[in-house]
């Protein structure tokens, strides 16, 4: 019975969020901003977008710009 409680506690700590984004299951099923940018025909640049393109958002976590023509 102690083994069951131990496993239950370990699972609780494994899947709980100690702080924002620290949980293991938080990113499952989500697409990254960079992936969404590229899928929508954009590209990521660390500098500002060229004049013939439009800013669509960011490509986190580094936060470069997502530009699209």
Curated annotation (Swiss-Prot):
Tissue specificity field: Highly expressed in kidney.
SUPFAM superfamilies, sorted: Defensin-like
Stretch forming the signal peptide: 1-21
Tagged with keyword Secreted: yes
InterPro entries given in the database record: Defensin_beta-like
Record flagged with keyword Oxidoreductase: no
Removed propeptide positions: 22-32
Keywords of the record: Antibiotic, Antimicrobial, Defensin, Disulfide bond, Membrane, Secreted, Signal
Pfam families: Defensin_beta
Tree of life domain: Eukaryota
GO MF term set: CCR6 chemokine receptor binding; identical protein binding
Compartmental location: Secreted; Membrane
Cystine connections: 37-66, 44-59, 49-67
GO cellular component assignments: extracellular space; membrane; microvesicle; sperm midpiece
GO terms under biological process: antimicrobial humoral immune response mediated by antimicrobial peptide; calcium-mediated signaling; defense response to bacterium; defense response to Gram-negative bacterium; defense response to Gram-positive bacterium; innate immune response; innate immune response in mucosa; positive regulation of flagellated sperm motility involved in capacitation
Similarity remark: Belongs to the beta-defensin family.
Function: Has bactericidal activity. May act as a ligand for C-C chemokine receptor CCR6. Positively regulates the sperm motility and bactericidal activity in a CCR6-dependent manner. Binds to CCR6 and triggers Ca2+ mobilization in the sperm which is important for its motility.
Binding partners and assembly: Monomer. Homodimer.
Name of the protein described by the UniProt record: Beta-defensin 1
Organism: Rattus norvegicus
Annotated gene: Defb1
């Amino acid at each position: 019975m102690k083994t069951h409680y131990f496993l239950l506690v370990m699972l609780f700590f494994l899947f709980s969020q100690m702080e924002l984004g620290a949980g293991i299951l938080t990113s499952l099923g989500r697409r990254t901003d960079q992936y969404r940018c590229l899928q929508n025909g954009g590209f990521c640049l660390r500098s500002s977008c060229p004049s013939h393109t439009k800013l669509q958002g960011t490509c986190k976590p580094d936060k470069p710009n997502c530009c699209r023509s």
